[in-house]
């Protein structure tokens, strides 16, 4: 591999192209093209950059359309138990953090090749009600044995033969929605998320750390998130259920004397 790297001088450096256009804070367009160190730019396996990302994001276009995302985007609802592309703090920070305030869709404008959705999403607003719908279809890197996916590859590197053998092997289709009612003192949301992996079944090799990981071809998650507050008390959280039997709940109570 070391000799192979020196036989392609263009592999010794990473390349990044990023273009962004914004108008009146309501229209955002972006393009990202990236090649990691060690990845060829042009050969029989690679044609140009290794990673491309494009998005068009519209905000507050009229009184009903709150947001529209086409291309690559991120999602966050509730406390993130069912779905969130937000940064996740450590355990200690989680205890003292306030409730999440980024509910809805945002553009994906980074070189992270995994933590995003690709498709379309929209938020429609009516009075105190937000209705969010989204659809995504992506090809993921993974270790495949026949129709079994034993692992996912998430580093985004495609330099070696073993990397190329795992590149874009597994299709993932995701769709769902969120309905949110919000007033100054009360907020409640309902989220549903369905995802499937084409003809593949996710079956990671059993290890102590992955005993409770999802296994199978498709899954469904639903959750309810809530926030109740006044001058003295703030209670918020999210409780989620999964079709494979998993249950999760994250709640916090803050008192202000």
Task: List each model region and its residues.
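Outer-membrane beta-barrel translocator domains and adjoining extracellular loop/strand segments
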Residues: 40-47, 81-86, 143-151, 200-208, ...
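Surface-exposed extracellular loop regions of Gram-negative outer-membrane beta-barrel proteins
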Residues: 15-55, 89-96, 192-243
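Repeated loop/turn-to-beta-strand initiation elements of outer-membrane beta-barrel proteins
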Residues: 25-31, 62-68, 128-132, 185-190, ...
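Outer membrane beta-barrel
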Residues: 38, 45-141
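Residues that define the transmembrane beta-barrel architecture of outer-membrane proteins
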Residues: 12-15, 48-52, 114-118, 171-175, ...
């Amino acid at each position: 591999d070391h000799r192979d790297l020196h036989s392609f001088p263009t592999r010794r450096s990473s390349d990044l192209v990023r273009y962004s256009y914004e108008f009146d804070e309501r229209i955002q367009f972006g393009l990202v093209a990236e090649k990691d160190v060690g990845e060829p730019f042009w050969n029989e396996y690679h044609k140009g950059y290794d990673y491309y990302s494009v998005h068009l994001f519209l905000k507050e276009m009229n009184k009903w359309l709150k947001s529209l995302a086409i291309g690559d985007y991120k999602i966050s609802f509730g406390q993130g138990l069912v779905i969130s592309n937000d940064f996740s703090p450590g355990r200690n920070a989680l205890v003292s953090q306030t409730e999440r305030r980024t509910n809805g869709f945002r553009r994906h404008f980074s070189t992270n090749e995994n933590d995003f959705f690709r498709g379309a999403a929209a938020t429609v607003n009516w009075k105190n009600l937000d209705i969010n719908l989204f659809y995504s279809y992506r090809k993921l890197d993974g270790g495949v044995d026949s129709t079994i996916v034993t692992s996912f590859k998430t580093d985004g590197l495609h330099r070696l033969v073993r990397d190329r053998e795992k590149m874009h092997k597994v299709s993932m289709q995701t769709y769902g929605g969120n309905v949110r009612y919000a007033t100054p003192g009360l907020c409640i949301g309902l989220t549903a998320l369905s995802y499937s992996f084409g003809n593949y079944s996710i079956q990671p090799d059993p290890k102590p750390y992955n005993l409770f990981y999802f296994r199978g071809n498709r899954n469904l998650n639903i959750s309810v998130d809530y926030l109740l507050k006044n001058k003295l008390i703030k209670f918020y959280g999210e409780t989620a259920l999964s079709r494979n039997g998993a249950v999760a709940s994250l709640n916090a109570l803050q008192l202000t004397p």
